[in-house]
Structure formats: C-alpha cells, structure tokens
Regions:
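Conserved glycine-rich cofactor-binding loop
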Residues: 10-11
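Conserved glycine-rich Rossmann-like NAD(P)H-binding loop of the short-chain dehydrogenase/reductase
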Residues: 24-39
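The beta1-alpha1 cofactor-binding region of Rossmann-like NAD(H)/NADP(H)-dependent oxidoreductases
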Residues: 48-58, 90
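Substrate-binding pocket helix/loop in short-chain dehydrogenase/reductase
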Residues: 84-85, 92-97
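Active-site helix of classical SDR
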Residues: 108, 144
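Residue(s) in the substrate-gating loop at a strand-loop-helix junction
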Residues: 128
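C-terminal helical subdomain
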Residues: 162, 168-169, 189-231
Length: 232
C-alpha cells in the first residue's frame, strides 16, 4: 500500500490533491478540522486542526499505528485574507501564522524524521506565488508563505541524500471558495475567477511530482494562469 497524508483536504486544493492521489492508487489520509473521523475504500478521514499540537499528535499516532509511515505528505492546510498592514490586528496575524506556518511545521516535524529513518518519502509543500512576489494587502499571508518557503528549503537541506524528496508547489490564484469573501471579479487589479487556475491543475502537478522515478527530485513547481505569467 502506498500511503499519502494530505492536510486541509476537505475542500479546495487539498480535496483535489486527495482525490487525484486516490485515483492514482494511493491510500489517502485526509486531515481537516471540518472532517469527521471515518474510512472508505483507500481513504481515511481524521478530524484535525493542524495548528493544534495535541490534535496533530493524535492524528499522527493513529496514522502511524494503523497505517504506518506515509510515503507522501502534502502540507496544504491554511487560510487567507486580504488586509493592509494597518487593518491587520495582532490576532489576525497570529491566527494566520498558526494555520499557515505553525501547522505545516507540526506536520512535517511529526512525519519527516520517520521518513528519513526509513530512507524514503516525499514532502510536498503547497506554497503560493506570495512566497516569492509581494502583493499589497498580504502582510500576514506573505509572511506565512515566505516563512513556509524558508522552512521547506531548510527541510530539503536537512534531508539531502536521505532518500526523502521534497517539492515546493507555488501556484498563482486558484479558483476556490477562499475568494468568495474577496469577490475579485468586482475589483480592479485582481485576476478574474474565470482566468484563475483550477484546484485540479495544482493537484495534477502534485501527483506528477510524487510519481516520478526515485532518482528524479522535482524540487519546485510554479503554476500561474497564462494571463498572470509576467509576475510569476
């Protein structure tokens, strides 16, 4: 059995990644705070807020105890808002950092050492174009994504030649429900939803990366809508 763990897998990119991995033959463990514990054919759902160390420990204990060390871990869970610096409260900032940066740290810390010990595995980090391009209104989000990029690169260095592969996937805007509150179609300067990437575009890139032969390490993938390419 080839085992994959996907965080934030109840909707959007995470759900699409989980579905594509399952279609590719993986047994997929979906983690999300909105899920209910359960199982189906080649799928296990665990309710887990990845920013909570206790919940992560519970989920990891179940995964490793019942299914083993995963072959693939996709760190995808996160949140998003657009607020200028002066509009972003300390609470806004800390909550977003907890979801987007602390959560991936906890998940990677829980699984990567066991992969290294086994001598194989693949960590996929879902970043963003905001991990290398600055946008007005993204003080907190950019801090989390630049931080995630930095953490991912350090993990890559620390796992070099261990048999564990790492891939950072940095997409431009993806048409998911995180944009509902923003309503980009009504605002100048925003990519219109019809022109955005689909969650499935990102998912297909993830599956492609993790199904390359062991000697091939896909270190980074950047995906942007064609209308967006000059800034990507």
């Amino acid at each position: 059995m080839t085992l994959a763990v996907v965080t934030g897998a109840s909707r959007g990119i995470g759900l699409a990644v989980a579905d594509e991995l399952r279609a590719a033959g993986f047994h997929v463990v979906r983690l999300a705070r909105s899920l209910t514990d359960g199982s189906a054919d080649r799928q296990t759902d665990l309710r887990c807020d990845v920013s909570d160390p206790t919940q992560v420990e519970r989920a990891v204990t179940r995964v490793r105890g019942e299914l083993g060390v995963p072959d693939v871990v996709v760190n995808n869970a996160g949140t998003f808002f657009i607020k200028r610096l002066e509009e972003t409260s300390p609470k806004d900032f800390s909550e977003l950092i907890a979801a987007n940066l602390t959560g991936p740290f906890l998940v990677a810390r829980a699984f990567v050492p066991a992969m290294v010990e086994r001598g194989s595995g693949h960590l996929v980090t879902i970043g963003s174009i905001s991990d290398h391009v600055a946008f007005s209104g993204s003080t907190a989000y950019a801090a989390s994504k630049f931080g995630m990029r930095g953490m991912h690169e350090v993990i890559r260095t620390e796992t070099a030649k261990s048999g564990v592969r790492t891939t950072l996937v940095s997409p431009g805007p993806v048409d998911t429900d995180i944009w509902d509150a923003v309503d980009p179609d009504s605002k100048p300067g925003f990519t219109k939803r019809k022109d955005m990437l689909r969650a499935e575009d990102v998912a297909e890139a993830v599956v492609w990366a993790v199904t390359r032969p062991p000697k091939v390490d896909v270190t980074e993938i950047r995906l942007v809508p064609t209308v967006y390419a000059p800034r990507g």
